[in-house]
């Protein structure tokens, strides 16, 4: 069976009895996995980007510690350093945390400076709805700090119009993925992984 409504209306056993639907709305054979099950499956294989996990930051850390995957999971939030530190204390220093900064907002540079001053993140996820000189200046500032740059190319508002559809449907990969790479991005979130990989190989950027 499949379900409707909010997950918190069901017990775990009830959720486990359900099956996920595919993109066309058809029931599949797949169950809803727990976070612990996912991390056990991924252990020693890949990095996991937890997109909606900030509200469960400390709970997530306990699961990561239990499964031995603390170094394989990236937690993130669109919040200033002071708030994240106040809400999570020493746990923040034990996990890989990636700030999400919306570069088109007035608070962007202050948010970047706060993290660079206090914790030197390994990476920043940079979100921007335009590619103005000011946005590019802030991208350069993050790049020059030594932190890796994560850019999401799923839709235009996340990457200043340099999105997946521009690469694939408009046949402009250089203006999409190429532009993102030229900004220094080392991490790209895409719905077209095979095509992006092909592009990287053609540009001699991937073996």
What role is predicted for each listed range?
Residues 1-103, 126-129, 143-145:
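Metal-dependent phosphodiesterase/phospholipase catalytic core, i.e.
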Residues 25-29, 106-207:
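C-terminal active-site rim and adjoining tail of enzyme catalytic domains
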